Design a protein with these regions (language model features):
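Short catalytic helix/loop segments, enriched in acidic residues and glycine
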Residues: 20-39
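Conserved phosphate/ATP/ADP-binding segment of small-molecule kinases
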Residues: 171-258
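Positively charged, low-complexity intrinsically disordered leader regions
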Residues: 1-20
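Alpha-helix C-terminal capping segments
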Residues: 30, 38-48, 289-292
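Conserved N-terminal subdomain of the carbohydrate kinase-like
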Residues: 48-135, 325-339
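Histidine-anchored nucleotide/phosphate-binding helix
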Residues: 34-44, 147-153
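Conserved post-catalytic alpha-helical subdomain immediately downstream of the catalytic base
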Residues: 262-332, 339
Length: 339
């Protein structure tokens, strides 16, 4: 059965290597966006993944579609209109210098989608899962309405729903995010967040934890997950835990709470090649595991391992296989040549 993701995909422009914006004379052009990243990961894992969005009816939109098709993602329900594609500029950090992102996405075709533009009943026919992030309703008031329209249709058709809160302060205020997401999350079966999202969006903070300093208290995050479950009725809450040593080195783990038990993954010490899309690869890994009948603990370990591997891959998309993820989750983190 199909897995549907919905959101905006953008043109990613990045200086080569670790050059800064002020140095760069050339930029590499690729594509990326939260929900598209999830769809590509799932397609790479062998799932029937379909991405729904709005794209400009021009050669840039066509190039984007071709890129998605390259990885086996269905674009049957993509809406194409006259207009522009959102762009984001990415400057990769290193050592103590953090990465930097600049958005140029206002007025994109995706942000301009309206209620009624997408036939959600057709989209969710033969679908088992629907995924979106908090970025999508933040794009515009009408996109918040379209996301709500999608959630209602998915719930009516018995499709399980996941959401990654993905708070972006450059898109909306905490107050507006809390109001809008408070209307959407009650539809969600699996809620995904990072260390700070629950606090930013809903004011639910983990005690004894400091994200900036990389201080993580598991019991504090158990309380966060429990409060989210009780407030919104989610079946599961997953939280990624990133301890930043520097822009080049992070400690990475995650937890999953199912309303009764909390499962905690092993922790990975990562040397980072590209951290963009790390959270999306975690979400894709969870969706894969849960739709394949994994236990909650095994689904979590698969998700964290998939995301760990993504941090070693250039670009938004996670170009790894199920076998590679399973090998790491099973304990093979040596990095030895596979012959």
């Amino acid at each position: 059965m199909k897995i549907i993701t919905f959101g905006e995909i953008m043109l990613r422009l990045q200086p080569f290597g670790f050059e800064r914006f002020v140095q760069a004379r050339e930029y590499e052009a690729t594509f990326g966006g939260g929900e598209a990243n999830v769809a590509v990961s799932l397609a790479n894992f062998g799932k029937d993944a379909s991405f729904v969005t709005g794209l400009p009816d021009n050669d840039i939109g066509k190039a984007c579609l071709q890129e998605l098709h390259r990885y086996g993602v269905s674009t049957e329900f993509v809406v194409q209109k006259s207009g522009r594609m959102g762009i984001y500029y990415c400057e990769k950090g290193a050592s103590q210098r953090p990465s930097k992102v600049i958005y140029d996405r206002a007025g994109s075709v995706a942000a301009g989608l309206q209620v009624g533009d997408i036939d959600w009943k057709a989209v969710f026919a033969d679908a088992e899962w629907f995924h979106f992030t908090g970025i999508t309703p933040a794009l515009s008031d009408n996109m918040a309405e379209v996301t709500l329209e999608a959630c209602k249709a998915a719930k009516e058709m018995g499709v399980r729903i996941s959401c990654d809160l993905n708070y972006r302060k450059k898109l909306w205020s905490k107050e507006k995010a809390g109001k809008v997401m408070g209307q959407l999350v009650p539809f969600v079966d699996l809620l995904i967040a990072n260390e700070a999202d629950a606090d930013d969006v809903f004011g639910i903070k983990a005690a004894k934890s400091d994200v900036t300093k990389g201080e993580i208290d598991l019991e504090g995050y158990r309380s966060v997950a429990k409060q989210l479950t009780e407030r919104f009725g989610c079946n599961m809450v997953a939280i990624t835990l990133r301890e930043s040593v520097s822009a080049s080195r992070n400690l990475w783990s995650g937890l999953l709470y199912d309303g009764e038990s909390m499962f905690v993954s092993k922790k990975y010490d990562m040397q980072i090649v590209d951290r963009v899309g790390g959270g999306d690869s975690f979400g894709a890994g969870l969706i894969y595991g849960l739709t394949e009948g994994y236990t909650p603990k095994d689904a979590l370990e698969f998700a964290v391992a998939a995301s760990c591997l993504k941090h070693s891959v250039e670009g938004d998309f996670n170009m790894v296989t199920v076998g590679e993820v399973q090998a790491l989750a099973g304990g093979d983190g040596s990095g030895r040549v596979q012959r």
